[in-house]
Regions:
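C-terminal capping/extension of enzyme domains
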Residues: 1-13, 163-180, 199-279
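A polyanion-binding, active-site-adjacent surface
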Residues: 2-186, 190, 196
């Protein structure tokens, strides 16, 4: 069984249970669809017969977390067909097939989401920084990057669930707590949280990962960058969301943001020897 099939099969019972409770609790019209990952990239014009080797055969696997999804929306199905988890997996795969280009994320296409600061500044910047460092040390090796969200459910407006409706978060905890299974199946070597600091996102990280310790990186304040020792992955870091423009009452400009990024990118570089796929 290929990895993408394992991932899809894992989602199915969780999603079915989640939908039952979202409907019974009167929440289904308040939320965007649960955020599911998929590995198939388009092949012969179809993601259904797509290729997952871009990820499975990568030497370095990086997962980048945002806060919660915006601009996602429920897929439109024909003939009143009931929405299934595979439809949401395919929605992710179509988005990735249209915008992911191995060494950069397309930000001038038709998707409004791909033009967001998360992809334009954060995702693209980190892809470029990691690929540049990897090429210098291991010129024959290749990295793959997956987008994820630490909040698998968000309101229709895409805002924090803590502000809008804590019942939605409880539904995720009770019926769609899938991030640990995603990590177990996908086995990322590096996890980067572009979630910022404080509630509710620090709590969401703690709900999904076992944090052994935290430490500073270089000379950067732990209010801006934190290295996380996680039980689940070799390397993990947390910093501000790319859309953040003010921190502790002062502006966060591009130069400061790149000081933060370069600090943990250099730390990743210094720890490439911890990555099994690079040895």
């Amino acid at each position: 069984m290929v990895l993408n099939e394992q991932l899809s099969n894992m989602y199915q019972p969780y999603f079915n249970e989640l939908i039952v409770h979202l409907k019974s609790d009167g929440l289904v019209d308040k939320v965007q669809p649960s955020f599911l990952l998929g590995l198939n990239r388009e092949k012969e014009g179809k993601v259904s017969i797509g290729d997952e080797t871009w990820y499975t055969q990568a030497d370095l696997k990086v997962m980048i977390f945002g806060k919660e999804v915006h601009e996602w929306g429920w897929p439109k199905l024909e003939n009143g067909t009931q929405l299934g988890s595979d439809d949401l997996v395919e929605a992710y795969e179509v988005f990735y097939s249209e915008n992911y280009r191995d060494t950069f994320f397309l930000t001038d296409g038709n998707s409004k989401l791909s033009k967001s600061p998360f992809f334009r500044t954060g995702f693209n910047g980190l892809m470029d920084g990691i690929n540049e460092r990897l090429k210098k040390v291991y010129p024959g090796k290749r990295a793959a990057f997956l987008w994820n969200e630490i909040s698998k459910l968000s309101t229709m407006e895409g805002r924090s669930r803590k502000v809008d409706d804590p019942m939605i978060h409880q539904c995720e905890l009770d019926y769609f707590h899938v991030i640990p299974q995603e990590i177990e199946l996908l086995k990322p070597d590096v996890v980067i949280f572009l979630t910022g600091f404080g509630e509710p996102y620090d709590r969401y990280i703690n709900e999904n990962f076992h944090i052994q310790s935290t430490s500073s990186v270089g000379n950067i304040s732990m209010d801006d960058v934190v290295k996380l020792e996680l039980e689940e992955v070799p390397l993990a870091y947390k910093t501000h969301h790319p859309g953040t423009t003010t921190v502790a009452g002062h502006g966060l400009n591009d130069a400061e943001r790149w000081n933060h990024y370069n600090a943990f990118l250099d730390d990743i570089d210094a720890n490439f020897d911890k990555i099994q796929g690079l040895q």
